[in-house]
From Swiss-Prot:
GO annotation (BP), single: translation
Membrane spanning residue stretches: none
Subunit structure of this chain's protein: Part of the 50S ribosomal subunit. Forms a cluster with proteins L14 and L19.
Keyword check for Signal: no
Name the UniProt record assigns to this protein: Large ribosomal subunit protein uL3
Pfam families per UniProt: Ribosomal_L3
NCBIfam families linked: L3_bact (TIGR03625)
GO cellular component: cytosolic large ribosomal subunit
Species in which this protein is naturally found: Staphylococcus aureus (strain JH9)
Gene: rplC
Length: 220
């Protein structure tokens, strides 16, 4: 069955394996995960748990900042006897009988050796050209060349008379939801509530990440 938790990417470091091998790892801090709702096949058509992460300030009348929860969010969290949460995500295909509304989801949900998928928002790179954004080749850099870092041809013959949708062109790069699959949990530190994941995960430092059981290898 699927397991999941939300956390913040702290950064990267390295640890030594049992055979002395140096392993690069990403540190993910996963605190304040609470089950806000359970969904079942009988009521909702599928099994899932709704997990909230990071407390939000209580409702405040006329508050314009999104740091404060609104009344619906506060009422929803109150059913779980929890504070309003800033981030709420759903994990499907879980063993709902193993969870209770209001229960804290801790890092020991995972153990060393688990294979996981990690989802995050990639770093934003701003407006970039086709060479950096899509990996296109540049032209000659010699003095007589008139083509250095321009995009590939996007024009069509008179038959089409238009640029096709999906043409690779300059534009905003990064800031996309990215999932890296089949990563390995190296260590779980229950005292500091952190998970060490082998390799790198999407997003900047302090970015939100979702850790869940690998969809390809997790249930084998």
């Amino acid at each position: 069955m699927t397991k999941g938790i939300l956390g913040r990417k702290i950064g990267m470091t390295q640890v030594f394996g049992e055979n002395g091998e140096l392993i690069p790892v990403t540190v993910v801090e996963a605190k304040e995960n609470v089950v806000l709702q359970k969904k079942t096949v009988e009521v909702d058509g599928y099994n899932a748990i709704q997990v909230g992460f990071e407390d939000k300030k209580a409702y405040k009348k006329d508050a314009k900042s999104n740091k404060y929860a609104n009344k619906p969010a506060e009422g929803h969290a109150k059913k779980a006897d929890a504070a309003p949460k800033r981030f709420i995500r759903e994990f499907r295909n879980v063993d709902v009988d193993a969870y209770e509304v209001g229960q804290e989801v801790s890092v020991d949900t995972f153990v060393a050796g688990d294979v996981i998928d990690v989802t995050g928002v990639s770093k934003g790179k701003g407006f970039q050209g086709a060479i950096k954004r899509h990996g296109q080749s540049r032209g000659p850099m010699s003095h007589s060349s008139h083509f250095h870092r321009a995009p590939d041809s996007v024009g069509m013959a008179s038959d089409a008379s238009r640029v096709f949708k999906g043409q690779k062109m300059p534009g905003r790069m990064g800031g996309n939801t990215v999932t890296v699959q089949n990563l390995e949990v190296v260590q779980v530190d229950t005292e500091n509530k952190v998970i060490l994941v082998k390799g790198n995960v999407p997003g900047p430092k302090k970015g939100l990440v979702e850790i869940r059981t690998s969809i390809k290898k997790g249930n084998k």
